[in-house]
Amino acid sequence: MAKYKKLGSVTLFDAQNTKEDLSKLGNPLERLSQVVDFEMFRKALEDVFENKAKKSHAGAKPYDVVMMFKVMIIKHYYNLSDHQVQYQITDRQSFREFLGLASGDKVPDEKTIWAFSEKMAKSGLSERLFQQFVDELNEKGLIFNEGQIIDASFVLAPKQHNTRDENKDIKNGKGGDLWNDNSNKKRQKDTDARWTQKGGQNYFGYKNHIKMDKVSKFIKKCLASAASLHDSQALDYLLDESDQGQSIYADSAYVGQCNILAKWDMIDEICEKGYRNHPLTEEQKESNRKKSSIRSRVEHVFGFEEG
């Protein structure tokens, strides 16, 4: 008699069965595919990414621009690093389904993802298309606007082995003037990442700041910064008129931002902070627990990145 439950043999219907199981569990990417016509973004993308002057058809063909924009949606929604995007697309069937990739299709590598993201950002396309995408979700009723969750997460970068003088120049904003006589070395240097400390632990890299719709859990707005930027300093950028009159949920790092909240008439659901000789009361602790239970919904977003 078998000790464990048999998992069953692989059949031709496994992929379809898995897709149906994901649908029953509420696959958010499948819902996006059903309600958003991503072809609406093609012309704007091709205007930036297609090389009109290129006559030769030699060399590897680029990935479809709409599919790559969907890759950016995955990166944006789950707040993933370029490396994690590549890994998760390879690993997760729901991601491949969303992108229209079969199991044997080649997945864009992290360098391709980075290059696409950089070109979108530098052309101004990133902010414009993501706003159009969020507007479309609003119109389709996928963003509920019944409260916003604010949070930040570290994205670690490789440590740089610079001299003290080089680090001083970088800190003073002169990093672009370094290593001009050695292009290979300069290409490998990261002059934007910064050191910071949190909870007694040192971090080197960047920080992702996000605003997430409380109900749909979709990231409506995000900001990438050096790790040294305090969480609260991103708040003014993240909030806008679409948040008018809503509740805001955040940890105690955002305490003291009354003027910014008042600007949009927001309801303060930020966790309170205890101070020396003024610890939190039991009532405040209980209030924080209730707020944190809602704020913790953001953890699934950062789970891929910090896991």
Regions found by a protein language model. Give the residues of each.
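Contiguous, well-ordered alpha-helical segments that form the cores/surfaces of helical PPI scaffolds
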Residues: V65-H76, D91, W114, Y237, ...
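Polybasic low-complexity intrinsically disordered regions
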Residues: H83, Y87-T90, G100, P108-S252, ...
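Charged, often Cys/His-bearing segments associated with DNA-binding zinc-finger transcription factors
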Residues: M1-D47
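A Lys/Arg-rich helix-loop hairpin that forms a DNA/phosphate-binding surface
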Residues: G59-A60, L101-D105
